[in-house]
């Protein structure tokens, strides 16, 4: 079977809600990475066969945001593109689709990843097209409804985390401790420059003066403690334990990678970072969607012909501390190998981009001692996706 390799992998810094990227469309974030990858690899843009990009909150952006990003990123009009929506798994699903298209021989070179600007998601006025006869009308927050609400139960993703709290007997202190650890690891990694190799700075033009250049993730917080987090009120349930402090944030960002057949990489003298070994997807009851990574991880390992003990490093998306703790309990993961540079609770969770972001962060950890990695994300609606990669040899 054709070996599929990852030849370049980058991400933007992750902006907080209403932060540095609030006026930067998702497709501009994606375009920045596309342009960088082309420049970095020296690849002829016309040699790219397809562009596949995850993006969840598409309302108001224009037709096919992936195509917009591709064209603005400098690709010729002959290169096709399409947008993927698998909620939080969109970015990783895009990479899987790229992988599948190369294995089947349809493509040789694909740019794949994810992008999201949650700050720019519009408010919707449903049923207004033909006018209102009378009475009050309300707006729907497209970010909350299309990105963060379980449509089957009509409640926020946070309630699915509360459901896992009850099912697994997870305490508030455990969640807050997990969140503090995520922040501390991210602070340490940021201060040590461990994200520098994976981040492409984003230049934001200003009406007056020089552009603002964003180089670091905005959500990383120093001096976070369990004591401080314990003062926060429950966010989703009156007597609940899930708070803004032990859940991932609402964020803006993008991540992208160059997916190629090994033969094409050799032909073009491009040195790959890693080999894609296999993927797994799984579904569960939507009310406990956060536990779905367990099944996805098991499938990805089986298809990759690997055991959990073979994995040197894990990048698992931290949608909620409770969700992450539940998955850890089921899989019995070694904590020293999981999210060693912090996770989404600290870094942020731009939903359409996160699937690619966790893989980018994972790839930049591979070396002669850390050769095999696994990444996974839970997905609203009761799903999950996972991937296994190995350092290229």
From Swiss-Prot:
Q: What class of enzyme is it?
A: transferase
Read off the SUPFAM superfamilies from this record.
Thiolase-like
Grouped into one coarse class, the protein's main location is: cytoplasm
* The keyword Ribonucleoprotein is annotated on this UniProt entry: no
The entry's active site is 88 (acyl-thioester intermediate), 349 (proton acceptor), 378 (proton acceptor)
Q: Which GO terms describe its molecular function?
A: acetyl-CoA C-acetyltransferase activity
EC number of the protein: 2.3.1.9
Q: What is this protein called?
A: Probable acetyl-CoA acyltransferase
Q: Which family does it belong to?
A: Belongs to the thiolase-like superfamily. Thiolase family.
Instruction: Write out the entry's keywords from A to Z.
Output: Acyltransferase, Cytoplasm, Transferase
InterPro entries from the xrefs? Thiolase (IPR002155), Thiolase-like (IPR016039), Thiolase_acyl_enz_int_AS (IPR020615), Thiolase_AS (IPR020610), Thiolase_C (IPR020617), Thiolase_CS (IPR020613), Thiolase_N (IPR020616)
List, alphabetically, the GO terms of the cellular component aspect. Answer: cytoplasm
């Amino acid at each position: 079977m054709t070996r599929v390799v990852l030849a370049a992998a980058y991400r933007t810094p992750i902006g907080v809600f209403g932060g540095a990227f609030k006026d930067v469309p998702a497709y501009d974030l994606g375009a920045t990475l596309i342009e960088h990858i082309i420049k970095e690899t020296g690849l002829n843009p016309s040699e790219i066969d397809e562009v596949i990009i995850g993006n969840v909150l598409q309302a108001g952006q224009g037709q096919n945001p992936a195509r917009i990003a591709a064209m603005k990123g400098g690709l010729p009009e002959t290169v096709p593109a399409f947008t993927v929506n698998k909620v939080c798994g969109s970015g990783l699903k895009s990479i899987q689709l790229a992988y599948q298209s190369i294995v089947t021989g349809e493509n040789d070179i694909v740019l794949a990843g994810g992008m999201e600007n949650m700050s720019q998601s519009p408010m919707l006025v449903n049923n207004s097209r033909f006018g209102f006869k009378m009475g009050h009308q309300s707006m729907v927050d497209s970010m909350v409804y299309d990105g963060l609400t379980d449509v089957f139960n009509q409640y926020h993703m946070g309630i699915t985390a509360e459901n896992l709290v009850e099912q697994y007997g997870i305490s508030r202190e455990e969640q807050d401790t997990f969140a503090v650890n995520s922040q501390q690891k991210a602070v340490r990694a940021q201060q040590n420059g461990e994200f520098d190799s994976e981040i492409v700075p984003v230049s934001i033009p200003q009406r007056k003066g020089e552009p603002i250049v964003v180089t670091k993730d905005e959500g990383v917080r120093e001096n976070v403690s369990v004591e401080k987090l314990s003062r926060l009120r429950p966010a989703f349930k009156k007597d609940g334990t899930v708070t803004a402090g032990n859940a991932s944030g609402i964020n803006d960002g993008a991540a992208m990678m160059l997916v190629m057949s090994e033969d094409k990489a050799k032909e073009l003298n491009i040195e790959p970072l890693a080999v894609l070994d296999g993927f797994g997807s799984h579904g569960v009851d939507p009310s406990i969607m956060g536990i779905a990574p367990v099944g996805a991880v098991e499938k990805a390992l089986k298809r990759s012909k690997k055991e959990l003990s073979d994995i040197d490093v894990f990048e698992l998306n931290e949608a909620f501390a409770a969700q992450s703790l539940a998955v850890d309990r089921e899989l019995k993961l070694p904590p020293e190998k999981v999210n060693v540079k912090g996770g989404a609770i600290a870094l942020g969770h731009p939903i359409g981009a996160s699937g690619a972001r966790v893989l980018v962060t994972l790839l930049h950890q591979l070396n002669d001692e850390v050769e095999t990695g696994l990444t996974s994300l839970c997905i609203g609606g009761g799903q999950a996706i996972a991937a296994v990669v190995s350092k290229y040899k």
